[in-house]
Amino acid sequence: MSWFLIAVATIAAVVSYKLIQRLRYKFPPGPSPKPIVGNLYDIKPVRFRCYYEWAQSYGPIISVWIGSILNVVVSSAELAKEVLKEHDQKLADRHRNRSTEAFSRNGQDLIWADYGPHYVKVRKVCTLELFTPKRLESLRPIREDEVTAMVESVFRDCNLPENRAKGLQLRKYLGAVAFNNITRLAFGKRFMNAEGVVDEQGLEFKAIVSNGLKLGASLSIAEHIPWLRWMFPADEKAFAEHGARRDRLTRAIMEEHTLARQKSSGAKQHFVDALLTLKDQYDLSEDTIIGLLWDMITAGMDTTAITAEWAMAEMIKNPRVQQKVQEEFDRVVGLDRILTEADFSRLPYLQCVVKESFRLHPPTPLMLPHRSNADVKIGGYDIPKGSNVHVNVWAVARDPAVWKNPFEFRPERFLEEDVDMKGHDFRLLPFGAGRRVCPGAQLGINLVTSMMSHLLHHFVWTPPQGTKPEEIDMSENPGLVTYMRTPVQAVATPRLPSDLYKRVPYDM
């Protein structure tokens, strides 16, 4: 009975505190929260669409209570600018739940670190050492190796009789490029052979990534109401097991590289070698090195494949745009060689298509939460210290106040007006902005552009037999990142000489 009374008293105290807080502050409008759980069970599976719908009713800034935590969601470019520029310093911390706390070793990485000396240090490592133009250029042959390997696989499979009518599932090929590219950049290892078979270490890597996404996407009551966690001990065990599994694999790879560096007395350009070389100079702990490596993997693997799949779906759905891109290829690159990243600057319409794809289909449509480290006002409303603020990037990109015909896929809009997408224009924010803008934005843009351009230069893409372009399912799957609900299927017809469909291997 005493435990029951304590529980009742605790609940009453929490409810009373929240009521007093709501009388004291002027919060943004939003759906009415329920006691204890807030709006947790009002949120629909595709979260960013749910918040967009609520914004249509309540306005471009809304309150969403997840448990006892206030989450403020903004859905306009003007308010995004307030969050990411005008009040950037007060909103530069991160909210970490149990999964991200475990993943980041209490914020010892970059993505989940609070703003402070540690964040400034590891951000400096990323911008001055890891994602420099020089290093990205030195790693370019890896990217070109992987996209040409993809072209070779598509060419082989599209000529099989059983695929000529039903087409190919593009996700398989794009996922292989993203997987091989990020593991080679981060770890210097290609876990997948030429036949697409993944080795034992690679299977473990993929399992860790998949399990981490499942844990990270949790909306369970225990994840958001800390004082109920004792009721879910299995969750704590799952987080601990996942962290140990990830660290075991990463330490083994780090040890391999340490031994290789000792034998060769030199470091390669892979990120693991760079971080091990910089360890003493920047005073990087093992937890920070592991955290940074996995930040790059989680931020750079699925997101690139997802964006490229959406872009290709738009090409199949909009044959006019596909044809216009291919006409530009034929003028600039021709039909007697394969294109390279050096060609991108001479392909303005291709760049517009990439921008339009990022606008309509940002890989992380709901920006990772910024936590307030002080009381702040956004849009005239009070945001108390400790609140979470989200920018609904997907909604901002569909705001008719700043985009003409926002739901239309029309790359020409970027020929009419040059819009930056690396954090300087708050209408287009696929990589965030301000202090927490993604340091690897250019790498992501290069890889998506490379995957897309090679597929379009080498092949004409049409829907499977019996499917009309307008029948392609353009709905999203629930999750932190936006996979297409139905993987896009398409028929590939080669358009270049057959000797241009071979992989250009690079051993590094």
Swiss-Prot record:
Changing G444D: In ref8; loss of activity. SUPFAM superfamilies: Cytochrome P450. Heme binds at C438. It is an enzyme of class 1 (oxidoreductase). Its EC number is 1.14.-.-. Highly expressed in stems, roots and siliques. Detected in leaves flowers and seedlings. Highest expression detected in differentiating xylem. It is found in: Membrane. It is a single-pass membrane protein. Coiled coil: none annotated. GO terms for biological process: coumarin biosynthetic process; flavonoid biosynthetic process; lignin biosynthetic process; phenylpropanoid biosynthetic process. Keywords: Heme, Iron, Membrane, Metal-binding, Monooxygenase, Oxidoreductase, Transmembrane, Transmembrane helix. Cytochrome P450 which catalyzes 3'-hydroxylation of p-coumaric esters of shikimic/quinic acids to form lignin monomers. Can use p-coumarate, p-coumaraldehyde, p-coumaroyl methyl ester, 5-O-(4-coumaroyl) D-quinate and 5-O-(4-coumaroyl) shikimate as substrates, but not p-coumaryl alcohol, p-coumaroyl CoA, 1-O-p-coumaroyl-beta-D-glucose, p-hydroxy-cinnamyl alcohol, cinnamate, caffeate or ferulate. Has a weak activity on tri(p-coumaroyl)spermidine, but none on triferuloylspermidine. Hydroxylates preferentially the 5-O-isomer, but can also convert the 4-O- and 3-O-isomers with a lower efficiency. Belongs to the cytochrome P450 family. This is Cytochrome P450 98A3. It comes from Arabidopsis thaliana (Mouse-ear cress). The lineage of its organism: Eukaryota, Viridiplantae, Streptophyta, Embryophyta, Tracheophyta. The gene is CYP98A3.
